Amino acid sequence: MTSSTIPNPTKTQGILLLDKPEGKTSFYLVSVLRRLTGIKKIGHAGTLDPFATGVMVMLVGQNFTRLAEKFQNHDKAYRATITLGIETDSYDIDGEIVAKSDKAPTLEEIHEVLTSFQGTVKQIPPMFSAKRQNGKKLYELARQGLSVEREPKTVTIKTILVDYEYPILTLDIDCTKGTYIRSIAHDIGQMLGCGAFVSKLVRTRSGPFQLQDCISLPPQG
């Protein structure tokens, strides 16, 4: 996506679609927009992990930030690149490696496992997540070396195989709010018996908002 001029008038209110760059937090986008526009009331309609890229629906002005929950409830779509044969503690590329395997699943095995990731399923959130349990965020406990029992959450997903050439598995995933793509990758690895983690993640859609409609932030000094 090419960079485009960010609206600057302080009275601007509305929705701004950004393509989040890799390595940046969702709050980074909020802070940059606040600085560029002078508007303090800026939020978003769903966070992305730092390693992920893609659609960020930025809500500018009080009339839109107060609608955050409505936008957050939208279904999402992702292109996930999953590396097989390696398991990390965070289920993604930023985590520490905790297991390795030389097993190379066949395409038939991949197809069979993916049938478990269609429709309504129960999903256990990863320890490295912002989900709260007993008043604490799970990632805070994980950083202390703790692992606690997590309540499974019901989500609805549709998984499409895009490409498979060991060790790289590429999937398109449509899902409801609160679905952890990292958990899908981890669970696939467990079912295949080889381990897996998300090595690249692109959010391609958030509700009606598509990646091709997003702009990139201008370079920051």
Language-model features and meaning:
Residues 1-221:
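Catalytic/RNA-binding core of pseudouridine synthases
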